């Protein structure tokens, strides 16, 4: 029965069902998720830290690769630039 259904479709359908169930519970006045302000602040701090680490690491790595001749292609480019007197 489910052989022809994409895994992504199944995941999206399950998430939709959870979201709809949560909305029904909210409309009935039932708290589906008990979350306090401290939990939200902790989550925010964790996400901020993770984002800054990923951002700093990726931009640093990209800048380092971009500005240095460390790959095989980069080394060939450096040789060509030196040969044409275009290297600083």
Swiss-Prot record:
Annotated signal sequence range: none
In terms of InterPro entries, this protein maps to:
Holin
Subcellular localization: Host membrane
Record's keyword terms, sorted: Host membrane, Membrane, Transmembrane, Transmembrane helix
**Transmembrane portions of the chain:** 15-35, 45-65
Q: Which domain of life is it from?
A: Viruses
**What's a Pfam family in this record?**
Holin_SPP1
Stated membrane topology is: Multi-pass membrane protein
Asked whether the UniProt record includes Disulfide bond among its keywords, one would answer no
Its cellular-component GO annotations read: host cell membrane; membrane
* Protein family according to the UniProt entry: Belongs to the SPP1 holin family.
* Name of the protein: Protein bhlB
Q: Which organism is it from?
A: Bacillus phage SPbeta
